[in-house]
From Swiss-Prot:
The modification Phosphoserine is found at S155, S162, S170. This is Capsid protein. Residues 155-176 are annotated as: 3 X 7 AA repeats of S-P-R-R-R-[PR]-S. The gene is C. It comes from Hepatitis B virus genotype C subtype adr (isolate Korea/Kim/1989) (HBV-C). Residues 177-183 are annotated as: RNA binding. Residues 136-183 are annotated as: Disordered. Pfam families: Hepatitis_core. It is found in: Virion; Host cytoplasm. The lineage of its organism: Viruses, Riboviria, Pararnavirae, Artverviricota, Revtraviricetes. One of its GO terms (biological process) is symbiont entry into host cell. Homodimerizes, then multimerizes. Interacts with cytosol exposed regions of viral L glycoprotein present in the reticulum-to-Golgi compartment. Interacts with human FLNB. Phosphorylated form interacts with host importin alpha; this interaction depends on the exposure of the NLS, which itself depends upon genome maturation and/or phosphorylation of the capsid protein. Interacts with host NUP153. One of its GO terms (molecular function) is structural molecule activity.
Length: 183
């Protein structure tokens, strides 16, 4: 089976492959970032978004892969074979997990459309011969300030003003949202 873990999010393995392997932070840094920004939502029993679910699965996969690597390290007698397994896990599997973690953390942080726009911009930049491209690659965190995304075929919708309340009416109080998870 040819399964692309990015397809349902509008991206692809090929689109992420334009980013060099040293672009992605270490798994430890990515896990720390996910924990710092999204711990409550990731630990919540409630469904928050497909990106939260994918992030949970990638984190669980990495944990299981580390368990396997520990087992192999303890049970494989031949040091050369042990080194081959550890190297394969770190280089190949580590890169795939780093890409997954980066993609979903970035989508949650910047928005899916911005991340997709960034991947396309970077792909165009990297494929343009050096003599014809700007010296610096696009930067994700600055993209929303410079990118204008317009919906096709529609002019901006005008909002009609909401009906005014009489001054004697008091607005309804909102229920406390402290019990709800913050997705």
């Amino acid at each position: 089976m040819d399964i692309d873990p990015y397809k349902e999010f509008g991206a692809s393995v090929e689109l992420l492959s334009f980013l060099p392997s040293d672009f992605f932070p270490s798994i430890r840094d990515l896990l720390d970032t996910a924990s710092a920004l999204y711990r409550e939502a990731l630990e919540s029993p409630e469904h928050c978004s497909p990106h939260h679910t994918a992030l949970r699965q990638a984190i669980l996969c990495w944990g299981e892969l580390m368990n396997l690597a520990t087992w192999v390290g303890s049970n494989l007698e031949d040091p050369a074979s042990r080194e081959l397994v550890v190297s394969y896990v770190n280089v190949n599997m580590g890169l795939k997990i780093r890409q997954l973690l980066w993609f979903h953390i970035s989508c949650l942080t910047f928005g899916r459309e911005t991340v997709l726009e960034y991947l396309v911009s970077f792909g165009v930049w990297i494929r343009t011969p050096p003599a014809y491209r700007p010296p610096n690659a696009p930067i994700l965190s600055t993209l929303p300030e410079t990118t204008v995304v317009r919906r096709r075929g529609r002019s901006p919708r005008r909002r009609t003003p909401s009906p005014r309340r009489r001054r004697s009416e008091s607005p309804r109080r909102r229920r406390s949202q402290s019990r709800e998870s913050q997705c």
